[in-house]
């Protein structure tokens, strides 16, 4: 069986292009095209690359910020890297007049705000009174009347071999929002960014390329929530952006986006989505440019009095995919798990959500969730309410298009515990498997915890795994985490906090003999702390492949972990 696909490394990103899946004819499987087309899904640049470029769009950089932006840069090579970090301070756009979105569905609006729905939105004036320009398709709306606070600020850093550097954007600029452009003189640089505040923490990979479209399956502008879209244009030319949003009751195109929102060249702009799509429990989003390219992050703070609480950041998806892999998950009295699947295309998407339970010989094999998702709309499945998954049994998940219409999928996992691992984690899955994954951010310092979950989706081939810590200029094997065997179809959770004590500079590399998917959990454990960050790492393009078809065979594995040691509990 050979499902490997070559990955072409470009300065602007990575392309995993048009490779047929060669299947075993004896298995009576059809040969199918399986691609990750023109994807800027973050992948690690090879050590031999001439340069590395990363784009970290989202975060705040002032004393009143709710998502302090910190960039973590890891040099995985044996040589020093010269790195330039450019911080782009930005403004948050004020509400546009009549900011509620216009419903695209003529019958929509039954569940909306009567005073604001259906009203046409006037374009906002910019800071200096410039007139809007005519462009193809209609008027352009200048970004906002709050000018960017300062010019971009650059700092040069030398990162020693196999070392990492953390840089808060507040060290360079003061602004309501700030983005970072990270450039190095060679390959082997992996960059993540974190958002932190009293509301929680989250850490995710930055982008390795810009795009002319970005999609988000999940979002919320409910009364006790705040959703901020951060639009980062690192290029000299202006970008003109349109946006459309799927809510629980309709599809909306806010006036400021319908006319074309201008994001000036070399700037960052924050959009409080609640100004345009007010008080909606569910908001899926698509942003497309008429001109130019962007990087877009979504930051959400949820502070429900008796419900979810936490802080999350997520890079958008530049291209919907046919499959999304989630290595980790659980449903219980303490943990609520939801999946949101969004169809930004113009065709009906038939989707299956398949589950692989730990110890299936004991816990069974659940039937998949089947969804039919209309063009431009989304579906949410609450696994706690669905009832097909046994409580307190960790599992992996594959969200797959059954009719080859690509989709965007996110997992929403929340913990309402009074203490310990609690908070809100929202992430896309991985559209690829890879034999190597890197995590630049991480800590096992006091009142912190870190673990990883590995899933081997191959229905036939086991994989052997090594876990290495990149600390203090060395790449060191983690004790008791070498030559680990993950059988076909199985997953494995590893508690790094047990093996690596009190390291606040912990970066991790996971290497396997076969392609796998790896998720990392970061948690804040202090009595007054809240923070739960779960997401995939940065895969190597070498040996990357798209996932196989689901396997229904039961696996025989005993993880040996108590529930409290599981990655999300």
Model-based region annotation:
Residues 5-13, 17-72, 189-234, 293-345, ...:
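Conserved functional hotspot residues at active sites or interaction interfaces
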Residues 99-144:
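Long intrinsically disordered, low-complexity regions that are acidic and Ser/Thr-rich
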Residues 34-37, 102, 107-109, 144-175, ...:
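Intrinsically disordered, low-complexity Pro/Gly/Ser/Thr-rich segments with frequent PxxP/GP/PP motifs
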